[in-house]
Amino acid sequence: MRHRVKKKKLNRPHSQRLALMRGLARELFEHGTIITTTAKAKAVKPFVESIITKAKKAALYAKEINERSNGDPEIQALRSKNVALRREINRHFNDRKLVKKICDEIAVNYIDRNGGYTRIIKVGRRRGDAAELSILQLVETKSEENVEN
């Protein structure tokens, strides 16, 4: 019975599955969209969304740090929370430039959005093995949609 079993195994051992998740998430954050199998897209979506949620919290702390004066006693606590969240994100990728991009560019776009940062669009089947392919992409924010129109 599969009671309370949430994650997909993708027919891989734990270390390979974790490496796959990190690789897919890295490509998604770098390029904004990736084409992969539907099973992999569904498996990586919660991983990406949790990272964006942590980055949003770090971005909010950074914004509050910038708004407060340097003499404020709570500013040190905010800085430590911001650094802790960035380190938690960095634990997955081990790339400071990518963490900076996630926290300072990507997460800022989703400050007003409560979840649902990615979308999966099914595009058909792969030619070689007929695996179902999907596009996993970051959802555009309202500010980007207004610029395009």
From Swiss-Prot:
Q: Which Gene3D superfamilies match?
A: Ribosomal protein L17
Keywords noted in UniProt? Ribonucleoprotein, Ribosomal protein
The protein's matches in PROSITE patterns, at most eight in alphabetical order, are given as:
RIBOSOMAL_L17
Q: Does the keyword section mention Cell division? A: no
Q: Which GO terms describe its biological process?
A: translation
What Pfam family is a match for this entry?
A: Ribosomal_L17
Which GO molecular-function terms appear in the entry? structural constituent of ribosome
Q: Which domain of life is it from?
A: Bacteria
Keyword Cell inner membrane included in the entry's annotation: no
InterPro entries hit by this protein: Ribosomal_bL17, Ribosomal_bL17_CS, Ribosomal_bL17_sf
Q: Which GO terms describe its cellular component?
A: cytosolic large ribosomal subunit
Q: What's the subunit arrangement here?
A: Part of the 50S ribosomal subunit. Contacts protein L32.
Family label: Belongs to the bacterial ribosomal protein bL17 family.
Q: PANTHER family recorded for this chain?
A: LARGE RIBOSOMAL SUBUNIT PROTEIN BL17M, RIBOSOMAL PROTEIN L17
Protein name, per record:
Large ribosomal subunit protein bL17
Which species expresses this protein natively? Kosmotoga olearia (strain ATCC BAA-1733 / DSM 21960 / TBF 19.5.1)
